[in-house]
Amino acid sequence: METSSSLPLSPISIEPEQPSHRDYDITTRRGVGTTGNPIELCTNHFNVSVRQPDVVFYQYTVSITTENGDAVDGTGISRKLMDQLFKTYSSDLDGKRLAYDGEKTLYTVGPLPQNEFDFLVIVEGSFSKRDCGVSDGGSSSGTCKRSKRSFLPRSYKVQIHYAAEIPLKTVLGTQRGAYTPDKSAQDALRVLDIVLRQQAAERGCLLVRQAFFHSDGHPMKVGGGVIGIRGLHSSFRPTHGGLSLNIDVSTTMILEPGPVIEFLKANQSVETPRQIDWIKAAKMLKHMRVKATHRNMEFKIIGLSSKPCNQQLFSMKIKDGEREVPIREITVYDYFKQTYTEPISSAYFPCLDVGKPDRPNYLPLEFCNLVSLQRYTKPLSGRQRVLLVESSRQKPLERIKTLNDAMHTYCYDKDPFLAGCGISIEKEMTQVEGRVLKPPMLKFGKNEDFQPCNGRWNFNNKMLLEPRAIKSWAIVNFSFPCDSSHISRELISCGMRKGIEIDRPFALVEEDPQYKKAGPVERVEKMIATMKLKFPDPPHFILCILPERKTSDIYGPWKKICLTEEGIHTQCICPIKISDQYLTNVLLKINSKLGGINSLLGIEYSYNIPLINKIPTLILGMDVSHGPPGRADVPSVAAVVGSKCWPLISRYRAAVRTQSPRLEMIDSLFQPIENTEKGDNGIMNELFVEFYRTSRARKPKQIIIFRDGVSESQFEQVLKIEVDQIIKAYQRLGESDVPKFTVIVAQKNHHTKLFQAKGPENVPAGTVVDTKIVHPTNYDFYMCAHAGKIGTSRPAHYHVLLDEIGFSPDDLQNLIHSLSYVNQRSTTATSIVAPVRYAHLAAAQVAQFTKFEGISEDGKVPELPRLHENVEGNMFFC
């Protein structure tokens, strides 16, 4: 087998780039596939029929202000106001039902009697917030007692103005093959989805985009004062078979309702309130909603008092005519003790501040309970993620029952607004015919051919195709209680059985116990210093034993130093149990990082891949990793992997860059160096040069792009921004022509599920669907390449945005299916193609480099250190 070491290293001639001048339109479907065995399936799409296709939605803008002109924020009060408006002024609105988005837009079926309205809406039943706590500008006990017996109505001004007309029939062309995906169609779908959200809001649900959650939605405790709850995602979708309603089970995280003190104890894993870190508590509690136990009223927390409850003073006031007159200073503790005669155990702890920045309003902790259905958006710990995944799994039949029950319970088509459109929704799932593609043949060592069964294989009694000897290596242990010598012996023994020649490690380095409590960066620096004292020469490879699985803070600094400064490949492990299977999986990763090949596709080994074998073809996987929710100071990390050693499609190199937080389009594919005509620091320059270097001095004439992480609204940006950058980078290398492109978006974050119509198991590996539930005109299909053993399988949704190469549907689907079998660190078909998976791994690993960094004070995104030349060309991310 020819490898990169035998290929010429001729330089690429570099010239200024030519203007790209390419405008691409999203391609339409070219037909459907035919290969594979047919299989009967059902899916969580429910057919929608419309008896009144000529209905027109009328859109109106809504402005809500207080009587003195202040804008009203918050969907809760806004929805309450609009409900009251409809009850009060229904006749003025001609009795028309309103679909309100909770913000600034409402819709009706047909027009309202006039284009503009000004309403005065009075909402009763609200207590005055400032009368239920104690405020620095606050009220006395006398005023508070009077407020117990009185409701305070408030008046609001609501203005409604005509904005636009949206014909419903723009989304109904799907049934006649005449669907046009323009803005009107998207607007009509949005109206229908708003109706679903409004229906859920009326039932008191928590709304998260197009999903809604009940307080009794199968709570799942995951620790830390957080619980997961199960709800439903629902959205209308245009499909090849007509309009459909897509319903799926969804899960979100909420705060566990109850006493605030109990939440803080659980969140910080402490036994008593005295152990609570109040600085952390203040950050955690900010913006949470609580209900006062001494008053039936909710508040939003803005912070904690600066002093304990028994020391925090406020001015007690009484009303003297129209004026409030201070009578004396009193502590919050004394006020509540005198007024409510209840013992207060939180006297030495801070109070909750539920007022405003210029007017604090204090409540003792034990008088406050967290209200239900408050979404928790902070990152989960590794343990919490595991518990959530385990608790939220549903087998196919269980999920089918949940969805069917929901359709019968919620009666979507009985909604007055939808009924006014003549919309009816079938109660049974859509039936669809799929195909099961034949798994590709794999090539192992000793010229062994093997065909996987249901997306799985193993290396029992098999040799790696191209093993890399491990000659100079060491083991370092960051205080994990294990026998490092035993691990090395077992690894050597396992390597022999797989064809890997492994020498004994020349050093076993244990962490100095005095640094065990130090910070992660310091621990890594001390370990590196110890290694350099013990090692005569840098090792080729290091096996690193971490103290925790998946959540170790040492991982990022360790990888950063080894890959960027030392140029040493490393494999991190946390061996809870040593077994042959565990060590085999570790060796698959090590061999890939060192430049070996574990297995190849049979058609790849024999140079027989359609449309790729004869024309130099570069395959790219692209992804962007963002920081955790709520961290706007953490830069995003863009990663692109490119194939090498053409015509192979199993070997890749990664290039990684940071970019502005939450920016989804990759902006570093082409980065010309200022004041030069030849320099390019962009991602694609690295990958083009690597392809040329390892592919017998050939430049790619075809480029296949697999893009992950973009939504349908960003498809055109991929073509106009990212493909354009790739063309410019290519032309910078001295080429006047432009390669042919095939651009495919790979999505996993969607809500379509496939089920066997005649069996309880998940759909078999290789299942593909390209009819009925796909887009009416665009080129897309669903593929479940992997075999789901736990829960319900989620297929990948592939959108073909551009196909200049000209794949037939069968050739493209089989190529994508085959690319799910080339992940060198896996012995199962992956749920998404390997290039996308590799890009995700590279972005996630390098994101750990910046874990302890943020945006600088001048707003600049920190640049990543470049990988050391010893490791940059290999698959360090495996």
From Swiss-Prot:
Molecular-function annotations in GO: siRNA binding
Record's keyword annotation contains Repressor: yes
Expression by tissue: Expressed in roots, cotyledons and shoot meristematic region.
Region of interest called Disordered, as start-end residue ranges on this chain: 1-25
Coarse class of the protein's main subcellular location: nucleus
Coiled-coil segments on the chain, per record: none
Highest taxon listed in the record's lineage: Eukaryota
A Pfam family recorded for this sequence: ArgoN
UniProt cross-references to SMART domains, sorted A to Z: DUF1785, Piwi
Domain PAZ: 259-372
Family, as annotated: Belongs to the argonaute family. Ago subfamily.
Function: Involved in transcriptional gene silencing (TGS). Component of the RISC complex that associate with the small interfering RNA (siRNA) pathway involved in direct cytosine methylation at endogenous DNA repeats. Required for the accumulation of specific siRNAs derived from transgene and heterochromatin-related endogenous loci. Involved in RNA-directed DNA methylation (RdDM) at specific endogenous loci. Probably not required for the accumulation of siRNAs derived from transgene inverted repeats that induce post-transcriptional gene silencing (PTGS).
Name of the protein in its database record: Protein argonaute 6
Gene: AGO6
